[in-house]
Amino acid sequence: YTGYLTFSIKPSGLKAADAPVRLKFTFAEVPSELNTPLEPYKGGLARSWVQDEIVTIMSVPHEMTIPRRLAGRYLKIELLGISSSFDFVFDKLTFKAQTSVTNEAPALASTTDPLVRDIYEVGLNTLKECMQTVYEDGPKRDRRLWIGDLYLEALANAYTFKNHELTKYCLYLLAAFAN
């Protein structure tokens, strides 16, 4: 999923918080990704693209939406700092998915092989996740518009979701930087 995480915390006892609460949220596509250390980072893209976020909450109770759009199917929450005399609980945890897709994709024929149907559904979900403000190469990666991704995703979109405005917008963006 690609979108925004909202959560709220509240005290679990009678004592008031005498220090901030610091949490780290890590998003992953597969469970094993959550156990892979991020540091020291050796990737080719900037470290800031990695799907993790550290937040410091100054007072409890508190509700917040992480302002950065994130992507993943799994979430790990780590407690990085808290007063030893205070404890809290999550009161609410929601993830609001986001996409530019507004139309339903056409259904396959009822006689379609189940394996082909499964592949079609995975492809639709992947395309939907990559259709954001532009056709992205992947919501977890760099979120840049690449001409190869535009070509493939626009072709798939033409037969499925038919969001032609997104295709037109991406073409205008690329045309603006032609020279």
Ranges and model annotations:
Residues 171-177:
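Membrane-interface coil-to-helix junctions
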Residues 123, 153, 174:
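Conserved hydrophobic/aromatic pocket- or pore-lining residues that grip, position, or stack substrates
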Residues 1-137, 149, 165-170:
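Extracellular/oxidizing-compartment recognition motifs
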Residues 162-166, 178-179:
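Proline-centered turn/helix-capping motifs that create local helix->coil transitions or kinks
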Residues 141-149, 162:
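Aromatic- and histidine-enriched alpha-helix N-cap/loop-to-helix transition segments
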Residues 131-142, 177-179:
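Glycine- and aromatic-rich loop/turn segments at beta-sheet edges
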Residues 152-163:
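Well-ordered alpha-helical scaffold segments within catalytic/enzyme domains
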